Design a protein with these regions (language model features):
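Helix-coil boundary and interhelical linker segments in multi-pass alpha-helical membrane proteins
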Residues: 23-41, 75-89, 123-141, 174-180, ...
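Small-residue-rich segments of transmembrane alpha-helices in multi-pass membrane proteins
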Residues: 19-23, 67-77, 115-129, 165-176, ...
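Membrane-proximal helix-loop-helix units in multi-pass membrane proteins
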Residues: 89-165
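Helix-loop junctions on the outward
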Residues: 57-65, 79-85, 110-111
Length: 237
């Protein structure tokens, strides 16, 4: 367990995502092998990082479990960079985001840190999806639009403003770009979850699970050889 002195990520779903996503994807890879395995390797340190992202930097060295997680993530991260040098860009961006959190918090501009985190995550998807054989341009834009909804959701909970939840209707219209983008309609569940939840951690758990569903969905499409852009061109024909 993570030391109680640490500020555990408010998402609280990092561990859920880490365990489930790789349990499912490994099973899929056994059925059909391909370079998607490289994408899975790349995402291991990302999800390990999510699990401790909001931990207090000054106290991290006091927790042997967190140190072990960072060590494993670093080893796998190096292997990922050997697979594709572009991965180095995303890892460096994540590190900059992690260590700049105290500064942005001090000047009360944490939204900059959050925006950089979204860009880093979308960039990660762009690299891995391209590596898996999918042109990820449209998907990356749609993913960014979906992730912005997470911030509206958290703000809605903190400020008790249900109006902010209305943004989560926007991802539903991504289906106009591609019929397979219907998966982003999962954002509607944010509305119900936020209204029913009495603690932010439940909203965070739901958010992590929703992201997990999207990741697994895209990986399955990759293994099935479905090109999202080709499907989109047929849709608009």
């Amino acid at each position: 367990m993570i030391d109680h002195k640490l500020k555990v990520s408010r998402e609280y779903g990092g561990w859920i995502s880490t365990i489930l996503i790789f349990g499912l994807t490994i099973g899929i890879v056994i059925i059909k092998r391909g370079n998607i395995i490289d994408s899975i390797i790349f995402w291991i340190p990302i999800f390990l990082g999510i699990s401790i992202f909001d931990a207090n930097i000054r106290n991290i060295t006091n927790d042997k479990y967190v140190i072990a997680i960072l060590f494993i993530a670093t080893i796998i991260g190096v292997l990922s960079i050997l697979i594709d040098f572009l991965f180095l860009i995303t890892y460096l961006l994540f590190l900059i985001i992690f260590f700049s959190r105290p500064y942005f918090k001090k000047i009360r501009k944490t939204y900059i840190n959050t925006a950089l985190g979204m860009i880093a995550l979308v960039l990660s998807f762009f690299i891995t999806l391209h590596f898996a054989g999918i042109n990820a341009a449209f998907f990356s834009i749609a993913l960014l639009g979906y992730m912005i909804g997470a911030e509206f959701t958290v703000s809605s909970f903190l400020h008790k403003s249900k109006q902010l939840l209305a943004y989560n209707i926007v991802p539903v219209f991504f289906i106009l770009l591609n019929p397979f983008y219907l998966i982003f309609s999962i954002s509607l569940l944010r509305i119900a979850l936020t209204i029913k939840s009495d603690k932010l951690k439940y909203v965070g758990i739901g958010e992590s699970i929703f992201l997990l569903v999207i990741v697994v969905y895209v990986i399955i499409l990759s293994l099935l050889g479905i090109n999202l852009v080709q499907i989109s061109s047929v849709f608009f024909r």
